[in-house]
Amino acid sequence: MNDVHNFNAGPAALPKQALERAQKELVNFDGTGMSVMELSHRGDTYDRIHTHAIKKIRKLLDVPDDYHILFLQGGASLQFPMVPMNFLDSQATYILTGAWSEKALAEAKHFGKTVIGASGKDGNYKQIPALNQISEHAQDSYVHMTSNNTIYGTQWHAFPNTKAPLVCDMSSDIFSRRIPVNQFGLIYAGAQKNLGPSGVTLVLIQDAFLQRAKSGLPAMLSYDTFVKSNSLYNTPPVFSIYMLGLVLDWLEESGGLTEIENRNKAKAQLLYEAIDESDGFYIGHAAQDSRSNMNVTFTLANDALTSVFLQEAKEAGFVGLNGHRSVGGLRASIYNAVPYASCEALVDFMKQFKNKHAEKGATV
């Protein structure tokens, strides 16, 4: 089958160079006569893979020395309860910007008092709250936020300076841009958007914040367990970590975060211009100042054309353009590995579709 234009929301497109290298090394890794998936996680060969991935993360994100880099499992969904289990004392503040922050809040409620510091729910999550709208409280154990909202297509373009440690779910935009790591107490991210295949969850945790963690927790749910064991307390997701390292090799060879950020902005601008210049045929969901550079969400003025759009797009070689099941519409996820050429091709298709169906999709 020929290559497709992959706009899946996650698992998402991976760099072809990383996939081809994995293919080449799949059966016999580094002369061992074994696949990466067959290596002992206690052996020297895997240790080099593990260490390589950690070093790449620290270098590319400019992670300060007082931050621990962990590889966990369970996805961001396990981090939703794990964060409050370890750190929620008197109360925690949650900033709501979409479905994933709502899920994080729901899990935190099992472990203690929570308050909402700001919310975009009343506006159907079309806009990120202004920094000066965020309410903090002296008794906060931490403040939790979600940096990018895949379902609604919104993204924080600046982060709040909070008095309590800031915890952030960066699953869908980590490594898509430069970030001030030292502004956060803890960052977590599932891998399957920008880091590699699913199966591993990256956690960055400041040592000073770690010292506040509760003791007496189940070993597998304690961050301290994985800090002390270098994420080798139990068998890690070896292949996922290996792939993460290959993806970061590609990222570095592509020019690092500055270059990839510029590419991502250019891809997003191309798509948003096509939406804005469609005379109302396409309607963007997110407010302009909150638009995501990772997930471009939009609808058709004539909703009856949505299924037609998806079918014709599929026939033209585009996949993953359906909106999330909870909101419908359309969504183009343009993570790091999605080429600019795919975005150009999508824009051309959108224009052709509009010209073909303009009478049915009357402007609003």
Curated annotation (Swiss-Prot):
Its EC number is 2.6.1.52. The keyword Transferase applies. Pyridoxal 5'-phosphate binds at A76, S77, W100, T150, D169, Q192, N234, T235. L-glutamate binds at R42. GO terms for molecular function: O-phospho-L-serine:2-oxoglutarate aminotransferase activity; pyridoxal phosphate binding. The modification N6-(pyridoxal phosphate)lysine is found at K193. Its main location: cytoplasm. GO terms for biological process: L-serine biosynthetic process. One of its GO terms (cellular component) is cytoplasm. Binds 1 pyridoxal phosphate per subunit. Coiled coil: none annotated. Pfam families: Aminotran_5 (PF00266). Pathway: Amino-acid biosynthesis; L-serine biosynthesis; L-serine from 3-phospho-D-glycerate: step 2/3. Keywords: Amino-acid biosynthesis, Aminotransferase, Cytoplasm, Pyridoxal phosphate, Serine biosynthesis, Transferase. It catalyses: O-phospho-L-serine + 2-oxoglutarate = 3-phosphooxypyruvate + L-glutamate; 4-(phosphooxy)-L-threonine + 2-oxoglutarate = (R)-3-hydroxy-2-oxo-4-phosphooxybutanoate + L-glutamate. The keyword Membrane does not apply. Catalyzes the reversible conversion of 3-phosphohydroxypyruvate to phosphoserine and of 3-hydroxy-2-oxo-4-phosphonooxybutanoate to phosphohydroxythreonine. Homodimer. This is Phosphoserine aminotransferase. It comes from Shouchella clausii (strain KSM-K16) (Alkalihalobacillus clausii).
